[in-house]
């Protein structure tokens, strides 16, 4: 009992303890800030390309390509543009809806269309519709409500590399399929390299590469402005908690002109982690030393995976946690569906959650596989019958374990608050 009391005291002290943060959420990848330092030019270019939707709606289908490396502000800029453009359209009495689709998460044409429908609050029948039928439902929905739809296809290069040519053709040349006089569907294609489109047929490529907007990597000075905007204007930290030299240090690590990657996402992630390290050490200031420790822990290759994990709902996270638990207990990499479900039930009950039924757990695993978080293979010799074996597709580490635990805790807190 004494040990339990000591642990409880430890947890309570940590909860009550001081923190350098004020609004840490403004440092997360999903946050859309009020300002976008050093992306004003790109916002203007997007606005010029799409202004005909407002001046002459339905006359043309706009297509824009955005190209730039990871962390150069492509996603946040397009989302901010979509938010502002829709507001301005509304003020002019026009209905413009902006949808943002991540092709790495919605990995097939059908899944992408279902997600577009979800963002439109359009119910898709459960019966097995084809992609073409689903798109027709979406278009009819737009037609009835006189809506202009901007579809951003983020990580479009992934879709190009993994999808059948006919799916790509259908998507980008939709008006060859639809007998529609009024053009209601417009595209923003986001990719890392324009060269990823080199393999496309010329007839498709000509439809995609209409207007190209480049997003160059950030310089040290630009990263400094971005970090300071989150610290000062967005109030990520308590006033005076982050030393100016710390911000300079992080900016110099990642600035393209200083030999870094120019990746703002990693710069923000490093700043957030430095703040957490300061909290752990009981420091009221975020110092260069904290930034150095944070930098040593940041793994650029995990950045995309971490984004995917942060998008999971509670019970999807519990399935991932179950696989990690089995790995720790048994030392194996692959586990049967039955074992994973059994461990998931234990994890859920331990947290006071009602485990989902078998069909729902199977659906979670199917979605996790589509997202690239787990892999599945058929059992070989030595097992009775054909059994599906499941494994995490990412390396299991202490950092990953901490992330999963933190995300589970956050989902439980959100449920409690609602």
Curated annotation (Swiss-Prot):
The keyword Signal does not apply. The keyword Secreted does not apply. It comes from the Archaea. ATP binds at residues 72-76, 218, 230. GO terms for molecular function: ATP binding; ATP hydrolysis activity. SUPFAM superfamilies: P-loop containing nucleoside triphosphate hydrolases, Winged helix' DNA-binding domain. GO terms for biological process: DNA replication. InterPro entries: AAA_22, Cdc6_C, Cdc6_lid, ORC1/CDC6, Orc1/Cdc6_arc, P-loop_NTPase, WH-like_DNA-bd_sf, WH_DNA-bd_sf. Keywords: ATP-binding, DNA replication, Nucleotide-binding. Belongs to the CDC6/cdc18 family. Involved in regulation of DNA replication. HAMAP family: ORC1_type_DNA_replic_protein (MF_01407). This is ORC1-type DNA replication protein 2. It comes from Sulfurisphaera tokodaii (strain DSM 16993 / JCM 10545 / NBRC 100140 / 7). The lineage of its organism: Archaea, Thermoproteota, Thermoprotei, Sulfolobales, Sulfolobaceae.
């Amino acid at each position: 009992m004494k040990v339990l009391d000591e642990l409880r005291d430890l947890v309570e002290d940590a909860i009550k303890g001081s923190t350098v943060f004020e609004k840490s959420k403004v440092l997360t990848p999903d946050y859309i800030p009020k300002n976008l330092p050093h992306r004003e030019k790109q916002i203007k270019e997007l606005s010029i390309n799409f202004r005909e939707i407002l001046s002459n709606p339905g006359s043309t289908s706009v297509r824009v390509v955005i190209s730039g490396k990871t962390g150069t502000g492509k996603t946040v800029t397009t989302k901010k543009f979509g938010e502002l453009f829709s507001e301005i359209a509304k003020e002019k009495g026009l209905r413009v809806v902006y949808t943002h689709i991540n092709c790495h998460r919605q990995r097939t044409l059908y899944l992408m269309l279902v997600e577009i429908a979800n963002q439109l609050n359009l119910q898709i029948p459960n019966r097995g519709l084809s992609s073409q039928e689903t798109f027709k439902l979406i278009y009819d929905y737009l037609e009835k409500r006189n809506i202009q739809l901007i579809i951003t296809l983020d990580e479009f290069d992934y879709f190009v590399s993994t999808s059948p040519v006919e799916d790509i053709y259908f998507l980008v040349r939709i008006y060859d399929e639809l007998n529609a006089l009024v053009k209601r569907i417009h595209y923003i294609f986001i990719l890392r390299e324009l060269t990823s489109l080199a393999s496309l047929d010329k007839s498709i490529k000509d439809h995609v590469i209409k207007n190209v907007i480049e997003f160059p990597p950030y310089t040290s000075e630009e990263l400094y402005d971005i970090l300071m905007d989150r610290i000062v204007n967005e109030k990520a930290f308590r006033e005076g908690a982050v030393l100016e030299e710390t911000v300079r240090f992080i900016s110099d690590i990642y600035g393209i002109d200083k030999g870094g990657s120019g990746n703002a996402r990693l710069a923000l992630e490093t700043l957030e982690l430095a703040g957490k390290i300061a909290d752990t050490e009981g420091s009221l200031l975020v110092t260069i030393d904290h930034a150095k420790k944070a930098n040593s822990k940041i793994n650029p290759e995990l950045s995309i995976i971490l984004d995917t994990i942060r998008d999971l709902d509670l019970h999807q996270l519990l399935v991932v946690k179950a696989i990690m638990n089995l790995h720790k207990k048994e030392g194996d990499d692959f586990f049967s569906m039955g074992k994973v479900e059994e461990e998931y039930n234990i994890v859920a009950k331990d947290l006071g959650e009602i485990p989902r039924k078998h069909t729902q757990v199977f659906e979670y695993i199917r979605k996790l596989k589509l997202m690239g978080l787990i892999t599945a293979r058929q059992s070989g010799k030595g097992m009775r019958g054909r059994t599906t074996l499941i494994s995490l597709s990412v390396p299991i580490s202490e950092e990953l374990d901490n992330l999963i635990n933190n995300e589970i805790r956050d989902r439980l807190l959100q449920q409690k608050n609602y």
